[in-house]
Design a protein with these regions (language model features):
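C-terminal regulatory/interaction module of P-loop NTP-utilizing enzymes
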Residues: 1-167
Length: 167
């Protein structure tokens, strides 16, 4: 065919499109047979290691990368009954959410993240982020352990202990 309306398409032109599967109930429509016979449909899965390599090359927030390493199933957790789902594309959008200060800033940050990945994933990420940002400076801790003030927050204590075990 190689026509788009009245325009003849070059033999060197390739058109690449993406879409969702009908069975995912994500707003996709069944492709007509005529169109299906003119396309190659290639299913693919996303892999955390691939996404992390891409994310590092594209300056995605390091805390977000660490969160997804901690909770790998959160990279892509599609549920057709939810309005918003965590997907690789949605996590990229989360990385663009600016940080805000103060209690209202945390609420605003959470709301914006929830708008991208849904409430459950946002709650998990925001809790991880808050804990991670409160971890001690480990180079300082190792250089002067006697001056280290033990955190009162048990989750920060636990994360600090786990980090020290890994060193």
């Amino acid at each position: 065919d190689r026509w788009a309306g009245s325009v003849k398409l070059s033999d060197q032109l390739f058109i690449i499109a993406t879409g969702n599967r009908v069975e995912d109930k994500s707003g996709a429509n069944r492709m007509c047979t005529k169109l299906g016979n003119r396309l190659r449909c290639l299913p693919f899965d996303e892999y955390l290691d691939d996404w992390i390599a891409w994310a590092k090359a594209h300056n995605i927030c390091a805390v977000l990368i660490k969160f997804l390493q901690f909770q790998p199933k959160m990279l892509s957790d599609f549920d057709p009954t939810r309005k918003t789902n965590p997907t690789p594309r949605a996590w990229e959008a989360v990385s663009l959410v600016p940080s805000f200060t103060g209690r209202d800033g945390e609420k605003l940050f959470h709301a914006l993240v929830a708008g991208d990945v849904g409430e459950g994933a946002a709650a998990a990420y925001c809790a991880f982020r808050k804990m991670y940002l409160n971890l001690p400076d480990f180079s300082e801790l190792l250089a002067r352990p006697e001056q280290y003030a033990v955190p009162e927050d048990l989750s920060i204590r636990w994360a600090t202990d786990m980090k020290l075990v890994d060193l």
